[in-house]
Amino acid sequence: MKSLLVLFSYHHNNTEKIANVFEKVLDAQIKTPQQINPEKLQEYNLIGFGSGIYGGKHHKTLLDLADTLPQVTNRKAFIFSTSALTGKAKVAEDHSLLREKLQLKGYMIIDEFACKGFNTNSFLKYFGGMNKGRPNAEDLKHAEEFAQNLKQNLQ
């Protein structure tokens, strides 16, 4: 199974820490949105799209990439993120714009992953930030289990 992770990780590299776990389990390549040639994505069996959450959505570079993707048929993908706040409804909302863009292009979103990340944006920097130490060992373990499940379900 040939896998790719399209990652934009900024500030504290929270999402990159999660992507590194996925990379090992899925034997995947990691590329930034700027490194992607949309026409070459057909070479991959599974593509993960992830970034931190900014203003309730994935980073603009990831969303812009999704807009440029060619139409596909049932290409398997998953979405991942890190953010200051999580919870089932919050994650569903945060992932909704990227999910919709990918689905409109023909991608099947087979699963989604999110966890808390250290955040010092805005006024939080004056208080030492939020979620210091996240993603932590438990978050990384959950990321590994998530990737193992993806791998098993696709074989």
Regions found by a protein language model. Give the residues of each.
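FMN-binding flavodoxin-like domain, especially the glycine-rich phosphate-binding loop
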Residues: S3-L4, Y10, E16-K17, V21-K31, ...
